Amino acid sequence: MQKQKLVVAISSRALFNLDASHAIFESQGKDAFCRYQIEHEDEILEPGYGFSLVRKLLSINASCPDAPFVEVVLVSQNSADTGLRIFNSIDHYQLGITRAAFTSGMSPYSYISAFGAHLFLSTNVDDVTKTLAAGFAAATILSGSPTASSSTQLRIAFDGDAVLFSDEAERIYQQHGLPAFAENERHEAKNPLPGGPFKDFLRALHHIQNQFEPHDSPIRTALVTARGAPAHERVVRTLRAWNIRIDEALFLDGLPKGAFLKAFGADIFFDDQKRHCDSATDQQITAAHVPHGVTNQKTEKT
């Protein structure tokens, strides 16, 4: 099977803790921010919420350094001048990130396509929203732990509707309630759901997993959904139709997700609803909000 490289784009504030310099930018403006970054460019930045994920992603390449499975690229609203501190920190931590786009205050989302990225992680919700609208997987890292889980395996958990799948079924739930949703999913059980914004990212992870024996895979995935039976059948048949393996599937029928994400040992969890992200961060799980689909449209109107 031909190897397909997974490309993940990440912003500087998602990779490193830039709270101090960002506070200066907010309170004193761009010029003060630039001076601060240059004056402190030899000071190594502390890890941000996406740091441990990046380190685990890049560690997958250790088994095949001449033909890496994963590339991480930096996309930042810093200038190249102020970005020197970021690259100094990348070098310090030996992250192996060699490609970057510095946009001097402009949204970098247009470079996601140029880099061929399967995923964009940022702390800037506007950049994430624009990336999703352009048809690429993107999420806003909210909070969590900057340190890795105890497992050397990278463990990624996904919500289903509006993340892996379209929000088609979620719209019925939001507009007509649970009984109508359950009846629709029972009726449509054998019809695969359309793909959501994270389908291609999951497929890229699956492609890497297929390069390894199952017991040696450096990646483990989980679907953690509020769906319960009988709405589970359509999900199972959808993944089967896509020919994508997901290692664990948790159908929680409305239970809070946090404890289950902790039990899975998730390094990151992607969900379109902030309350589920909050449930994850309550368990010190890094959560990334996907501002996509009917639930977020509803939030914008209120």
Regions found by a protein language model. Give the residues of each.
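Alpha-helical substrate-recognition element adjacent to the catalytic core
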Residues: M1-M106, S150, D159-F251
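Short beta-strand/turn micro-motifs composed of small residues
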Residues: S12, S76, L121-S122, T225, ...
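Glycine-centered loop/turn motif at secondary-structure junctions
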Residues: N61, Q94, G116, G135-A137, ...
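Short, well-ordered coil↔helix boundary/capping segments
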Residues: A229, F251, L255, F264-D267
